A protein has these predicted regions:
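Amphipathic alpha-helical dimerization/coiled-coil segments
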Residues: 1-17, 34-38, 81, 86-109
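Short helix-coil-helix linker/hinge
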Residues: 22-29
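Short capping segments at the starts of secondary-structure elements
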Residues: 27, 39-43
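A short acidic, leucine-rich amphipathic alpha-helix
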Residues: 46-49
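Key DNA-contact positions within bacterial/archaeal DNA-binding proteins
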Residues: 56
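Short, hydrophobic-biased segments on the C-terminal half of alpha helices
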Residues: 62-66
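Beta-hairpin "wing" of winged helix-turn-helix
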Residues: 67-82
Length: 109
């Protein structure tokens, strides 16, 4: 039996870098963010059409992107059922993650 190596996060790797990788290391999530940056606040159905990502898959990614903080949503989770929800890219958080990535790679800029 082959033992898979354990994924190890180096001690000097900040948690924000993991969030950066979760977004920019996934084509679907990158496509969602790109769509929202170009199109502005959008509903799930519009994001699905614009990115060609299936609605169930899109829902999973939107949830994760919201948890990471790169999406702003106009309604809190408890008020969303049966309502149209608009998602928008959080440019400030995206910039924070970009800066964390650059800081990790290049040190003090």
């Amino acid at each position: 039996m082959t033992v898979m190596p354990k994924l190890v996060r180096p001690d000097d790797q900040p948690p924000a870098l993991g969030d950066f990788i979760a977004i920019f290391g996934n084509r679907a999530r990158l496509s969602i963010i790109s769509y929202l940056l170009k199109s502005g606040p959008s509903m799930r159905v519009d994001i699905a059409k614009g990115t060609e990502i299936a609605i169930p898959t899109l829902g999973h990614h939107l949830t994760d992107l919201e948890r990471i903080g790169v999406l702003d949503v106009d309604l809190p989770p408890e008020r969303r059922r049966g309502r149209s929800v608009h998602y928008a890219a959080n440019r400030e958080r995206l910039n924070e993650l970009k800066m964390a990535h650059e800081q990790y790679l290049f040190g003090d800029l």
